[in-house]
């Protein structure tokens, strides 16, 4: 089970920060880790596998946005959550 308030307080920039990109990525990461553990024991849960793919895609889009808008926060968040970073695309 995910302790949502704990994840939010660990990644929030301020007291009322519940929807910033960093918080959203942290919550998605917690949900992804929880679902991945479930899928280890329930290998035939196809709906769960699809949900995992959708959450990974959403997290990837949010991380791409964060990388584009605030690169330092992106580096700090990926290090903190243990998420691998892709190569930086300079445009």
Curated annotation (Swiss-Prot):
Species of the source: Deinococcus radiodurans (strain ATCC 13939 / DSM 20539 / JCM 16871 / CCUG 27074 / LMG 4051 / NBRC 15346 / NCIMB 9279 / VKM B-1422 / R1)
The organism's place on the tree of life at top rank: Bacteria
SUPFAM superfamilies, per database record: S15/NS1 RNA-binding domain
Keywords per UniProt: Ribonucleoprotein, Ribosomal protein, RNA-binding, rRNA-binding
Family according to the record: Belongs to the universal ribosomal protein uS15 family.
Protein's name in the database: Small ribosomal subunit protein uS15
Subunit-structure text: Part of the 30S ribosomal subunit. Forms a bridge to the 50S subunit in the 70S ribosome, contacting the 23S rRNA.
Pfam families named in the record: Ribosomal_S15
Molecular function per GO: rRNA binding; structural constituent of ribosome
Role summary: One of the primary rRNA binding proteins, it binds directly to 16S rRNA where it helps nucleate assembly of the platform of the 30S subunit by binding and bridging several RNA helices of the 16S rRNA.
Gene3D superfamilies: 6.10.250.3130, S15/NS1, RNA-binding
Any one of the GO CC terms: cytosolic small ribosomal subunit
GO BP field: translation
């Amino acid at each position: 089970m995910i302790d949502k308030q704990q994840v939010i307080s660990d990644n929030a920039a301020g007291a009322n920060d519940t929807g910033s990109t960093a918080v959203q990525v942290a919550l998605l990461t917690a949900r992804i880790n929880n679902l991945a553990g479930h899928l280890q024991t329930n290998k035939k849960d196809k709906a769960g596998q699809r949900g995992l793919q959708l959450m990974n895609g959403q997290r990837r889009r949010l991380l791409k946005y964060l990388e584009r808008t605030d690169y330092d926060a992106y580096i700090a968040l990926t290090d903190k959550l243990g998420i691998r970073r892709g190569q930086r695309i300079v445009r």
